């Protein structure tokens, strides 16, 4: 392992864990469950109200037709998943969705597009969406694929708060998931985003057939970024018929909880978000994830093209747990630079 921390200066070399070597992250995974949960909750309480959860909404502004071959994704054009390619949504349709999300308590509005990378003419439309949603008093996030030179600056100038670009998995497992984009492509995009002052939303997907060591490797990659992401989505694979990963043995639910806990311990100031796969978890596992340090969820009946718990079900769960939602778009603790 290299002894030098990685800094965001595009282009950058692949991230090599230093402050949290993979073996140390793996040791957290291997702790007795109660000990791991205690440590995660202790860290969580040092930086956040343990009863608060952030509501974020994710809208697909351009669905289907993606040329990539991500093995988990129903939006890849090469897979027969029943997803029909659509053009980018009109501005007013996006704004209507944002208004509805805000009315239901969401403080962050995320816009996703199934592109390998955005064309400049499409990026201009996204910039307008960002400006208008930002004017509503909501935080803005976009996930548009890889960004070329100058594109991150345009999004920053439009007022974008966060850019999502997941690492997906550990470098050692990456070739089992995707072949049309390499790991360095992802690192380069994250570097461009970080260098212009946009906050980074970056996490991964578990349950794709990876080992515990490889899950530890993913978290080591994330937590050794300098700085680590402000927002860390943890996705549980939603298996979609027609994709190569359909039929993969699912991850044990308690192993998913462990993953959330390890993310919290290694990235103490990040928003750790329960993302895809919540509908399949059930209330008990979601509750354990909150104890493990998750403090953000995607709210709404759909995430891009896959299902999500109904809004009413989420409200009822949070009431059962005595949790409350983040009430403003500005959270001073979340804005502190991670360290």
Swiss-Prot record:
Its EC number is 2.8.1.6. GO terms for molecular function: 2 iron, 2 sulfur cluster binding; 4 iron, 4 sulfur cluster binding; biotin synthase activity; iron ion binding. It catalyses: (4R,5S)-dethiobiotin + (sulfur carrier)-SH + 2 reduced [2Fe-2S]-[ferredoxin] + 2 S-adenosyl-L-methionine = (sulfur carrier)-H + biotin + 2 5'-deoxyadenosine + 2 L-methionine + 2 oxidized [2Fe-2S]-[ferredoxin]. Its cofactor is [4Fe-4S] cluster; [2Fe-2S] cluster. It comes from the Bacteria. One of its GO terms (biological process) is biotin biosynthetic process. Coiled coil: none annotated. Binds 1 [4Fe-4S] cluster. The cluster is coordinated with 3 cysteines and an exchangeable S-adenosyl-L-methionine. Binds 1 [2Fe-2S] cluster. The cluster is coordinated with 3 cysteines and 1 arginine. The keyword Secreted does not apply. [2Fe-2S] cluster binds at residues 110, 141, 201, 273. Pathway: Cofactor biosynthesis; biotin biosynthesis; biotin from 7,8-diaminononanoate: step 2/2. It holds the Pfam family Radical_SAM. [4Fe-4S] cluster binds at residues 66, 70, 73. It is an enzyme of class 2 (transferase). Residues 51-278 form the Radical SAM core domain. Keywords: 2Fe-2S, 4Fe-4S, Biotin biosynthesis, Iron, Iron-sulfur, Metal-binding, S-adenosyl-L-methionine, Transferase. Catalyzes the conversion of dethiobiotin (DTB) to biotin by the insertion of a sulfur atom into dethiobiotin via a radical-based mechanism. Belongs to the radical SAM superfamily. Biotin synthase family. Homodimer. This is Biotin synthase. The gene is bioB.
């Amino acid at each position: 392992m290299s002894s030098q921390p990685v800094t965001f200066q595009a282009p950058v070399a692949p991230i090599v864990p230093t402050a949290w070597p993979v073996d140390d992250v793996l040791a957290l995974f291997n702790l007795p469950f109660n000990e791991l949960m205690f440590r995660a909750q202790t860290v969580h309480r040092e930086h956040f109200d343990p009863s608060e959860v952030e509501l974020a909404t994710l809208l697909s502004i351009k669905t289907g037709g993606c040329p990539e071959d991500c093995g988990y994704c129903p939006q890849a054009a090469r897979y027969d998943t029943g997803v029909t390619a659509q053009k980018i949504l009109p501005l007013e349709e996006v704004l209507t969705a944002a208004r509805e999300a805000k009315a239901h308590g969401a403080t962050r509005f995320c816009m996703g597009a199934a592109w390998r990378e955005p064309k400049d003419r499409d990026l201009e439309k996204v910039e307008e969406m960002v400006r208008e949603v930002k004017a509503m008093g909501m935080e803005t996030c976009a996930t548009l694929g890889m960004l070329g030179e100058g594109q991150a600056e345009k999004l920053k100038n439009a007022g974008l708060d966060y850019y999502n670009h997941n690492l997906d998995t550990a470098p050692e497992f990456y070739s089992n998931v995707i072949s049309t984009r390499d790991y360095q492509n992802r690192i380069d995009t994250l570097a461009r985003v970080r260098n212009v002052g946009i906050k980074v939303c970056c996490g991964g997907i578990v349950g794709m057939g990876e080992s515990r060591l490889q899950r530890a490797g993913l978290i080591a990659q994330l937590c050794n970024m300098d700085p680590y992401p402000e927002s860390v989505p943890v996705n549980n694979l939603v298996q979609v018929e027609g994709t190569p990963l359909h039929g993969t043995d699912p991850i044990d639910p308690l192993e998913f909880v462990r993953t959330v806990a390890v993310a919290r311990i290694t990235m103490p100031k990040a928003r750790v978000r329960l993302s895809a796969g919540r509908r399949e978890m059930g209330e008990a596992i979601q509750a354990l994830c909150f104890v493990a340090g998750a403090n953000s969820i995607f709210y709404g009946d759909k995430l891009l093209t896959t299902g999500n718990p109904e809004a009413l079900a989420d409200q009822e769960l949070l009431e059962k747990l005595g949790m409350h939602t983040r009430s403003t778009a500005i959270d001073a603790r979340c804005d502190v630079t991670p360290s």
